[in-house]
Amino acid sequence: MSRSGKDPGKRVKTARKRSASSTRWLERQLNDPYVKQAKADGYRSRAAYKLIELDGKFGILKGASRVVDLGIAPGGWAQVVRKVRPKAGIVGIDLLETEPIEGVTILQMDFMADEAPAGLEAALDGPPDLVMSDMAANTVGHKQTDHLRTMGLVEAAAWFAIETLEEGGTFLAKVLAGGTDNDLLKLLKSHFKTVKHAKPPASRKGSSEWYVVAQGFKGR
């Protein structure tokens, strides 16, 4: 018997009856070069390479000194920032519990809570010059519903950035294509000097995700 009181043999039997979708996911993970590289490089997720690639294209981390990572778990993006900008202050926030990362302050809370902006600014000892978000809502399998749920998060993250960034700062976020993208771009263009988007090579080919990079915050 295991510590949970369940017969391990039954778990093996269940594993053999994996759904086709979970089997495909497992096979994809096992054959994914980014997953293998993440393990070799010590990153917690393959998403780390998306930030590395986006930084190479847009210089997102150049000069960053106070960074907020919204939805930090499991921590791959924060690890990249820590490696590229070792002297930067980094604060991550997530509803999920996140394993500690050396040099990173992690707050387990809702970034949309009223007290979140002040708490993050206090932890950074000043306003952030980079707010980044790799968040996506839990999917339900309905493309438009998944799009709207994630875009709701992205828009909330954008407003968080607008309310907290120092002048000249940068906002980076994951977006799911699906119809309301233009509303987000319109919002960002009214608050940032340049707004660009890209799909980094590390994004899976079949994914509808892309990333928006808004630079040169105009101030409040």
Swiss-Prot record:
Basic and acidic residues bias (residue ranges):
1-10
The Gene Ontology CC terms held by the record are: cytoplasm
Keywords of the record, alphabetical order, are: Cytoplasm, Methyltransferase, rRNA processing, S-adenosyl-L-methionine, Transferase
Q: Could you tell me which residues belong to the region Disordered?
A: 1-24
Q: Which InterPro entries match?
A: RNA_methyltr_RlmE, RNA_MeTrfase_FtsJ_dom, rRNA-MeTfrase_E, SAM-dependent_MTases_sf
Compartments, record wording: Cytoplasm
EC number(s) in its UniProt entry? Answer: 2.1.1.166
Query: Which reaction does this chain catalyze?
Result: uridine(2552) in 23S rRNA + S-adenosyl-L-methionine = 2'-O-methyluridine(2552) in 23S rRNA + S-adenosyl-L-homocysteine + H(+)
The record places the active site at: 174
A GO molecular-function annotation: rRNA (uridine-2'-O-)-methyltransferase activity
Binding positions (S-adenosyl-L-methionine): 75, 77, 94, 110, 134
UniProt keyword DNA repair present: no
Instruction: Name where it mostly resides.
Output: cytoplasm
Q: Does Nucleotide-binding count among this protein's keywords?
A: no
* Family, similarity comment: Belongs to the class I-like SAM-binding methyltransferase superfamily. RNA methyltransferase RlmE family.
Q: Outline what the protein does.
A: Specifically methylates the uridine in position 2552 of 23S rRNA at the 2'-O position of the ribose in the fully assembled 50S ribosomal subunit.
Name this protein carries in UniProt: Ribosomal RNA large subunit methyltransferase E
